[in-house]
A protein has these predicted regions:
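Short hydrophobic beta-strand element within catalytic cores of glycosyltransferases
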Residues: 289-292, 302
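Membrane-proximal helix-turn-helix segments that form the acceptor-binding/catalytic region
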Residues: 125-149, 155
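Conserved donor-binding/catalytic core segment of Leloir-type glycosyltransferases
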Residues: 147, 183-211, 222
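A short, well-ordered alpha-helix in the C-terminal region of glycosyltransferases
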Residues: 335-350
Length: 370
């Protein structure tokens, strides 16, 4: 098959996240099976407009902000002649409304849709624009086959008017061969970590407040990731008088991330909504429990009481208190870190990128054959 993927960013982008990791891991494997994959995405400063990474031919156009407005024009003028067997639109940020494009076959791939959570992050005018851009999905994409990365995302699509029969749930994977436990690396004193982007909607502030409530002088919170909310979070740590025990690591390379997760007593995630929660499975693969919000997507990457703890998310003050209580439980029973971590590792091993790629390819072939 000749395949075109439309995604807001590629996996080399400095701001790449879980959607881009999925893109790389799944579609590089599809290339390895003998198929041709092109990617049309946004560009950034000082990067070539044409590239090839992991066998995927990359076409870059516009910026993060202009890509949705330039993608169709670029496709019409430069890529339509390639006569793709199938086009995959990763419904990421602002929809491209590809059912209005002239393509043979189309699949919509969804990690998660913003819905009302966009108002936690963006200014009211921008948030309203994104929210409104999602409103036509149920009507415009009603005849399009969907691939969702979690049952939570599938249910969100159904609520928006997409037929349940049109949705195939294919979970993400995790590289359990690279991400492995090493109990000898576990920190002697309680260490909690957050791994992800520092954006307002991720609610890292609740992780910091929960850690402050723990009130344990020998404990440490390490925050790995970049984003425009870092200064606010640093200010919060100072206001709570815990700046000496909260470390902001910035971007952490893959090899250092593994050691960070191995050292941690738990990984903590407070996001109100994710496609699935890849960072939770990365922690689990390293034998580290997870304390996370019982929110859409995330709840499918943690087995409450077995691989970590899920805390109610509706009331933020109560949520921070519940996260602090979960941290305190691990501190009071250190052996629980190993027990939960061992179960987490077994759980993570059931999610592989090979399976995700195989299931995705089977779904695409099924759509093309109809």
């Amino acid at each position: 098959m000749r395949i075109l993927v439309l995604n807001w960013q590629d996996f080399a982008n400095p701001q790449a996240g879980g959607a881009e990791l999925h893109l790389q891991q799944v579609f590089s494997r599809i290339v390895a099976r003998g198929h041709s994959v092109d990617l049309l995405c946004s560009s950034w400063a000082n990067v070539p407009k044409r590239d090839n990474r992991d066998g995927i031919d990359i076409y870059r156009v516009g910026t993060r902000h202009t890509y949705p407005f330039l993608a169709k024009r670029y496709y019409d003028h430069n890529l339509a002649r390639n006569n793709y067997d199938i086009v995959i639109e990763d419904l990421n940020k602002v929809p491209l409304y590809t059912p209005m494009w002239e393509v043979k076959k189309l699949v919509a791939l969804v990690h998660h849709l913003f819905g009302g959570t966009v108002f936690r992050e963006a200014s009211p005018p921008l948030a309203a624009a994104v929210w409104l851009s999602e409103r036509p999905l149920g009507l415009l994409y009603r005849k399009v086959p969907f691939q969702a990365v979690s049952k939570s995302t599938a249910e969100d699509l159904v609520r928006r008017g997409i037929s349940r029969n049109s949705i195939r749930v294919i979970y993400n994977g995790v590289d359990s061969r690279a991400l492995t436990p090493d109990p000898s690396e576990r920190a002697e004193q309680p260490l909690f970590v957050y791994l992800g982007r520092l954006k307002k909607y991720k609610r890292v502030d609740l992780v910091i407040r929960a850690f402050a409530d723990l009130n344990l002088p020998e404990s440490t919170l390490e925050i790995a990731g970049t984003g425009n909310y870092r200064a606010n979070l640093e200010g919060l740590a100072r206001s709570l008088h815990i700046e000496g025990r909260v470390k902001f690591l910035g971007f952490v390379p893959e090899d250092q991330k593994i050691h960070l997760l191995r050292r941690a007593w738990a990984s903590v995630l407070a996001s109100p909504k994710e496609g699935w929660g890849i960072s939770n499975l990365e922690a689990a693969a390293c034998g580290t429990p997870v304390i996370a919000a019982n929110s859409p997507g995330i709840r499918e990457s943690v087995i409450d009481g077995e691989t970590g703890f899920l805390v109610p998310q509706d009331d933020e003050e109560a949520m921070a208190a519940a996260m602090a209580a979960a941290m305190r439980g691990l501190v009071q029973s250190p052996n629980l870190v190993s027990v939960l971590g061992s179960a987490a590792r077994k759980f993570a091993e059931t999610f592989t990128w090979e399976r995700a790629a195989n299931d995705t390819l089977a779904h695409l072939e099924e759509v093309v054959s109809k």
